[in-house]
Amino acid sequence: MTELLSILYKLRIFTSDELSEALKGKVKSVEALLARYKQQGWIVAIRRNTYCMKDIASGLPVCDKYEIGSHLSHTACISYHTALEFHGLAHQPFNEVFVKSMTRFNSFSFDDVDYTYCRQTKEIVGMMTPKGNPYVRVTDVESTLLDCFDRIDRAGGIEELLHCMESIVLLNEERLIDYLARYDKAFLYQKTGYLLERIKEQANISESLLELCRAKGTKSVKWLTNNEESDTFVNKWRMYVPQELTSKEEYELI
C-alpha cells in the first residue's frame, strides 16, 4: 500500500486512465482501488473521473485551484483574472477559475470554487509552465494582460483590471507585439494602446508600441466597456470610455 500511495501522491491529480497507466501490473482493479482510497480518506473526487490526493495532516486536497484548473483537459490553461492572481497582480482573489481549453469540458464547482470553461479554437498564446510547478499551465503576464483587455468581463470588470495594472512594473514589449499580431484584432490593439498608455511611465511603455497600437487599432470608433458605462469619447484613441477614467484634457463629451 505504501508503494501505491507513493505513486498516487506523485501524480497528485489524475483521471482513472492516468492512474491505470501509472499502476500497470500493480493492481487488479483501478476502480476498486479508487473506491477504497476514497472511503479511507486518501482521495477526493473533484468531478466525474478526476481525483486529487488529500493532505494527511489537514485532510484537504493537495492541489490548489491552479493545479486543478490545469488538469481539466490536455490543453487546459489558467487564464484571465485567475492568471493575474497566479502572477501576483490581482487586486482581490476570486472564487472563479477561468480555464482556456481547446477541448471542451463542462464548467463545474468544487470546494466553493467555480471552474469556468473558456472556449479556445486556436493554440493558446503565451502558455507557460512555471519553474518549480510542473503541474500548472498558465498564460504569461503579457498574454494574460491582452486576454483581459480583450475580455474585460473576465478580468473582473474595468475597475478591477485597472487596480491589477497598478502592480505592473515591467512588460516584455517584444512579446506584446508578437501576441498582438497573432491575435490580429484591431479592437484589441485599440484597447491595448489606451490601457497601456495609462501606465506608460510606471511600466516604461515605449512610444513606438503606443504608436503601433494607434496605427493598427483606431480605424473605427469603439466602446471600451458597455455603451451605458462608456459615455466619454477619447479622441486620440477613437474610443468611448467611462468618464471617471479620463482627465479634462483628453476627452470630449458627445
Give the residues covered by each predicted segment:
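Hydrophobic/aromatic-lined pockets within catalytic cores
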Residues: 24, 38, 88, 150-153, ...
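Short gly/ser-rich loop at a beta-strand->alpha-helix junction or flexible surface loop bordering the NTP-binding
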Residues: 16, 35-36, 40-58, 62-124, ...
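Hydrophobic alpha-helical interaction segments
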Residues: 129-254
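Short beta-edge/loop segments at beta->alpha junctions of small alpha/beta modules
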Residues: 1-75, 171-184, 188
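An N-terminal domain-start capping segment
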Residues: 1-33, 107, 124-127, 134-140, ...
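Generic structural signal for bulky hydrophobic/aromatic residues embedded
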Residues: 22, 86-87, 148, 195
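Short amphipathic alpha-helical segments with coiled-coil-like heptad repeat character
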Residues: 27-28, 91, 153-157
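A residue-level signal for conserved active-site and pocket-lining positions in enzyme catalytic cores
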Residues: 19, 83, 145
